[in-house]
Amino acid sequence: MIRTIAIVAAAAATLIALSAQAQTAVPASRLPSGKIYLLPATLETTQWGWFDNAQPPVLTIDSGDTVVLETMMHSHNQVVPGRTIEEIKKLRTDHPGRGPHTLTGPIFVNGAEPGDVLKITINKIVPRAYATNFNVPGMFGQFPDKYPDGQVRYMYLDLDKMETEFLPGVFVPLKPFPGIIGVARKEPGRYSSVPPGEFAGNIDIRDFTEGASLYVPVFVKGALFWTGDSHAAQGNGEVNLTALETAFKEFNVTLTALKGVKLEWPRIETPTHWITMGYDADLNLAWAQAQRETQKYLGEQRKLSAVDAAALLPAVSDCRVSQVVNVKKGIHCLIPKDVAARGIPERPTTETAALYVTHAKNANLNTAMNDASMAMIKFVEEKRGVARLDAYGLASAAMDCRIGDMSGAEKNVHCVMPKSLWRK
């Protein structure tokens, strides 16, 4: 089968005909039906730190077409092996208000109009061979006052084994996904790449990987699609500010404008689950929004009243703290597509055979998250003998913080760390 592939250069596009099968290793079930465009990441096809509706599109496609694009490392590829933490901090302080992320785009989707929904399906992800994790000294992250000294660590990504040796003898599994992905806001003007919102953006949901689709409301003509902040792996919490930050050599996505679909807030579909999400500077309000979105989905999926959907939510929704470092903190909930499914993954309060566990509860979810995550960082530091900044970074890359019992006034947070990360 022959498909048309468009290669997009800085100033022009050239069409060539090639076999789709020869170009990618995407499974046949995920091969697109439209044209395939190639979009390299260059200074002409990327923006650093801002969304801006006035930015001219770098590529125009039809609904249902596929784009095989590249992304850059932070700050227009300036955060690469060899950069010191002092240099990384200066990139932030010299550009106040600007996010650190390099965004590929915008891509204009013909036919996408305000009120539509853009479906973004990830077909394939190929990261670069390295990643970085850093905390900027005394700035950002969950605990900037407790970590006034910063650190940057670079690591090789073993794409054959799909793991990286984060520390000597400590291996983190790779699960590549886009930290930032979304469309233009309805409001004009520049907007920092850091806070997420109704347009998606910096959602940092690690379950949004190959084979999953993001559905996001369209606010401007053409939708204007961007992506960046590419991750090789991330913990649920991303507490020290960064995941395993990388760039993608290939990010293969199909963009489809959906007509007649009502959606007010982003939602993700995986092969087995739907994922709802909530964002706010206050984690309590992010949690409240995630609950509302989950109840709304359960009502739609199972034809339930609002009261019945709220009652079902604790039995079927697996809710995690996506991140607490993007100005607006995030919580996402996984709901099984199987309507008969009941039960949620383990939420232990004490150590298990497979997991290190910390647990905290408080009427204020921000406090519960702070206490549970700091307890895990301290545990890794004191019990596993990991240096304090390394423990902070490892928690950001591999800790999984989950929302626990929802029945009482106190909120429960369970943070877990797989023991399998450590190899003797």
Residue ranges of model-derived segments:
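Bacterial N-terminal signal peptides
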Residues: 8-17
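Short, compositionally biased
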Residues: 80-98, 130-145, 227-244, 347-350
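Intrinsically disordered, low-complexity linker/loop segments enriched in Gly/Pro
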Residues: 124-209
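Conserved mixed alpha/beta catalytic, RNA-binding, or beta-rich assembly cores of soluble enzyme
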Residues: 178-202, 206-284, 295, 341, ...
